[in-house]
Amino acid sequence: MNILVLNAGSATLKFQVVVTDAQRIAADQDEKLIRGQIERIGGESVITLRLPDGSSRKRTAALRDLRAAVDWLVGFVTSAESGTGLSARADLHAVGHRVVHGGEQFRNSVRVDDGVLRGIEETIELAPLHNPHNLRGIEAARAALGDGVPQVAVFDTAFHQTLPEHAYLYAIPYPLYRRHKVRRYGFHGTSHRSIAYRFRKLTGRAKADVRIVTLHLGNGCSACAIKDGQSIDTSMGFTPLEGLVMGTRAGDIDAALLDYIGAKEGLSPPQVEAMLNSQSGLLGISGLTNDMRDLLAEANELRDRRARLAIEMFCYRARKYVGSYLAAMGGADAVVFAGGVGENAPEVRALICEGLQWAGLHIDADRNQALVGGQEGRFSTEGAALEAWVVPTDEELLIARDTYRAVGDGAV
């Protein structure tokens, strides 16, 4: 089955075409035909493509909106120029969509129908920055491919619906949860699920035999405690703002600071929230950038004090969460790193692991340095009681597989 995977944002569209079926999934032999992204939708859009032969291309096109972008994309991936071997729109058998928020309604990936669309619309107030664009992505794919091609919604929050009540509730008046569904939802769920699946494959362990802490570290960051294949706690909360220090997000913060900062700086509550989301984290502390690569260079080569401070705060917060999740699960088999920073910053991994010797985690410096650029493997020492791994996340592959399972062979 040829599956188009879409991740629609406000002015961006990430995509991939994956060939998968039951046999390919069982053998881990799914085929990725093409991937890329379209940026600056609404003007002169920039399109980045990774073709089947491994080559990369960039081009521009005037794409006025998301519908035009999806229509262009479908036309390109079914053209001879793309090299996919697909020659007609009918060769795309299904579309899998990343949807950020599924509320409490969606515990699994689901085939889209009118009821599902209404459910996603009802969660817009929980994810106003993401779900409207995810919905428009579904509508654009329907317009480009017709109602006969099934669409599947894969929710970032679904994996965390297994959190126990004592982990997902906030210690605020209980009626607020009953009336407004104020609770921890967690995000990056598809990524954490992907990491856990791949870790089990690499180690040959069954779901029931695995306790791991997964760290998705990129511009957005989150930690997850996974026991017996299920998420039992996660760092992001009602919104993605809670938890770890991130590229531009503050993470955990005293709630009383919102009013205090607003009063002192003359900012409204939405302005304070915007500051915590887009001007804080690594960027806010360093005053330089939210890019960990640049911060490491500033700290190591130019001895910039605030760059070093931002890195230390980032690693300290992550280490605290790992320690708390080890306590919550009564220990763990491994700490598993993923995401752009987790997969490519050995120094950051080492700093996070540095304070975990008490738990039996000891790293091999040479192995750690070697694991960059998509490499996967263990970098703890032989026999370490708590292992450390790098396992690149593959959300698009998981979305494609969920899409196949949701629609089955009947769509082909």
Curated annotation (Swiss-Prot):
Keywords (A to Z) from UniProt: ATP-binding, Cytoplasm, Kinase, Magnesium, Metal-binding, Nucleotide-binding, Transferase
GO terms for biological process, alphabetical: acetate metabolic process; acetyl-CoA biosynthetic process
Chief location: cytoplasm
A GO CC term attached to the entry: cytoplasm
Name of the protein: Acetate kinase
Gene transcribed to yield this protein: ackA
Site features described as Transition state stabilizer, chain residue numbers: H188, R249
InterPro entries on file: Ac/propionate_kinase, Aliphatic_acid_kin_short-chain, Aliphatic_acid_kinase_CS, ATPase_NBD
